[in-house]
Amino acid sequence: MVSPLTRGLACVVALFSAAATAGAQNRRPMTFMDIMELKNVGGVSLSPNGSKVAYAVSGWEHPNARPSTDPAKPDTAKGDKHETRAHIWMVGAAGGTPRQLTFSERGENAPQWSPDGRSLAFLSSRGSGTEAKTQIWILPMDGGEAYQLTASKENVSGFEWSKDGSRIAFLAVDTLPKTDEAKTTRRDDPQVFEENFRLSHAWVIDVATKRATEVAHGNLTVSGAPSWSPDGTRLAFQAAPTTMLRDPRSDIYIVTIADKSLKKITTKPEAGSPPAWSPDGKTIAFTILPQSHIARPDSIMDREIGNDHLILYDVASGKARDTYDPKIDVSAGNPRWTSDGARVLFTTGERAWNAVYAYDVASNKLNRVVAKMLIGTPSLSKDGRLAAYTLGSSDAPADVYVSDLTFASPKKLTDINPQLRDIALGETEVITWKSTDGTPVEGVLLKPLGYQAGRKYPLLVEAHGGPTGATNAGFKANWGSPGQVWAGQGWAVLYPNPRGSTNYGEKFTRANIMDWGGGDYRDIMTGVDDVIKRGIADSSKMAFEGWSYGGYMTAWVVSQTSRFKAARMGAGLSDLQSMYGTTDIPGYIGTFFSGIPTQKTLDFYRARSAITFVDNVTTPLLIQQGGSDQRVPIGQSMEFFRALKDRGRTVQLVFYPREGHGLSEYYHQLDKMQREQAWITKYTLGAERVVP
């Protein structure tokens, strides 16, 4: 339910709305409840003939429970649990009214057309019983109810139709042996750390008979969807020896279905994407990180930092062509072949946006097709004339669009969040500045609602996670980054992309190796200075926050400067030495700090840990984290909290039960946003202001 404090201060929103500028007309500022009501679209699939688009719409649902934003009206079904669910929709590629195709309480996602366009496959756990597993379901498009195709004892994931539509390849997790099931039942179930992984293997099921056969078994776990050869005799897939996240020992394999023989086709580890078979069956496209970036490719202790290269593997000769162009300097995304096999398309992050690139097979050239679009991976029609995809903007979440393969004139097919027309939004601008060493740095600046030049505003700085990530110019309205709510309350929000971020070339991405808290910190602080110089930020009213690596940067910032009046550290790293020994991605940490902590490297681990400088911290700090986080174990938050608490500093630590590295439960997401907003406004502005 919405807290009494939230209800009691709901009038703040109304008062602020009345003071909004004429440009916003009668629209009101965004609230956290507005964020919780937003829908998201994904899983776009264009029918083979290009006439229809299937897609999944997800959002929070509960048939009997909705928190009330009206203080006079109580919550319905108080205490009931909210669930996030997706359902399959369809719309004509020429336009028209979208139609919902699925309605189950368990939800559905990942729609995929059969090659003849007569059926639509999707994933759902809509089977009977509370412990129903995710299975593949088939919806006949000429009428009738969807039926369950697979009957796996464990969850099914990535899948793909064979080219003739008679079979589907899919992934399923290994089942527990009966002896293990019995031990689990009686709670005789000790776990050996980093051993006995439950792997995912590739299966093939006959659509007509529903007979499923495992085709790739062994000490490999397959990820992503398998890719069929055009003649239906083989599958290509990506696999690694363990299920450990970011296991660098990932390769591409081909399995012959008839005899289940397996062939590894990569000679260097670190495959970055699932493979895609060319229409003529002669070539397989996938991405990989060059071995030069991996010091010990046979070890979990080394991990990639750099651009993924698009590789074309000739099936007959076994030769691989690296298509990377250092002059273009982008990281390749998941490859998609055009229907004629002449080009391979991929989307990639490029500065504060996305771009689509095409590799021309004949000319051996990589070219940008379109830039400065927040575009998702396109789904192509069989004749190669049309593409369907998601497309977002700074002012709205993504909707479904269709266009030709130039992507020049996208046509909008959906209106997923029409309620946004009643909400006034802050303006988004991409800005650049120079760091202390002259390095150009870019960031996204969200201006306060009703911004007036010459007026100074409170500034919130949000550091992104990663560090191999970037903040784009997209819509800032989700539990992790509710920037539009802050803008609606009169704040400017800066999202810097310091060195170490992706999207700005490989050299920039690798620039913070052995330098966490160094150049990246200076990049951020010079960005803050730039916003102050622009006359936008009030230097006496600034706050800082971030999650994951952004949480590390938050802890580091408050240990290095007292410029910020308040801060919020989300799932952040405070002690890099203990982080290395307890995280589920030790190799990723080790890559940035010259391998495992040793007598030689220990001083550096300590020198870049905020816990070392905890005596310097005076900024009031809110710490938030999932209680079951394995990526950044909760000890990182507890260490920093205890050190600050014992020194008499202003600090609060909040754990969210059952949550991992991110927050997935309704009331946890809502509390995270409201609590951080109350904390930051209290210590920055001197008064609590909680938005519903």
Name what the model sees in each region.
Residues 455-465:
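Short beta-strand element of the alpha/beta-hydrolase
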Residues 84, 207, 462, 479-489, ...:
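Active-site-proximal cap/loop segments of hydrolase catalytic domains
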Residues 57-87, 102-109, 121-137, 145, ...:
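A flexible loop/linker signature enriched in serine peptidases of the S9 family
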Residues 53, 117-121, 168, 232-235, ...:
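Hydrophobic beta-strand positions that form the internal "hydrophobic ladder"
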Residues 48-49, 115-116, 163-164, 230-231, ...:
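Residue-level detector of Asp-centered blade-edge/turn motifs that repeat once per structural unit
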Residues 45, 56-57, 61-65, 169-171, ...:
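Non-catalytic accessory segments flanking enzyme active sites
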Residues 92-96, 140-144, 206-210, 256-260, ...:
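Short loop/turn segments that connect beta-strands within beta-propeller blades
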